[in-house]
C-alpha cells in the first residue's frame, strides 16, 4: 500500500468521524450516517490494501 493511499484512507476515516460527531451534536441523522459510511469505507479500503500487501509479501 502506498503512503498516499494510507493518507487518503486515514483522511476519509477522520472526515467521517467529524461528520458523525457533527451529526450527533446537531441531531442530523443523515450527516451522522454519512460519517459512519465514510469511516467504514476508509477502513474497508485499508483492509483491501493490507491484504494486497500481504499477498505481495510486503
From Swiss-Prot:
<dbReference type="InterPro" id="IPR036629">
    <property type="entry name" value="YjbJ_sf"/>
</dbReference>
<protein>
    <recommendedName>
        <fullName>UPF0337 protein CE1672</fullName>
    </recommendedName>
</protein>
<feature type="region of interest" description="Disordered">
    <location>
        <begin position="1"/>
        <end position="58"/>
    </location>
</feature>
<dbReference type="Pfam" id="PF05532">
    <property type="entry name" value="CsbD"/>
</dbReference>
<comment type="similarity">
    <text>Belongs to the UPF0337 (CsbD) family.</text>
</comment>
<dbReference type="InterPro" id="IPR008462">
    <property type="entry name" value="CsbD"/>
</dbReference>
<feature type="compositionally biased region" description="Basic and acidic residues">
    <location>
        <begin position="1"/>
        <end position="39"/>
    </location>
</feature>
Amino acid at each position: 500500500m502506498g503512503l498516499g493511499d494510507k493518507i487518503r484512507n486515514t483522511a476519509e476515516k477522520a472526515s467521517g468521524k467529524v461528520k458523525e460527531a457533527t451529526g450527533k451534536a446537531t441531531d442530523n441523522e443523515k450527516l451522522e450516517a454519512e460519517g459512519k459510511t465514510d469511516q467504514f469505507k476508509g477502513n474497508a479500503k485499508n483492509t483491501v490494501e493490507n491484504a494486497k500487501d500481504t499477498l505481495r509479501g510486503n
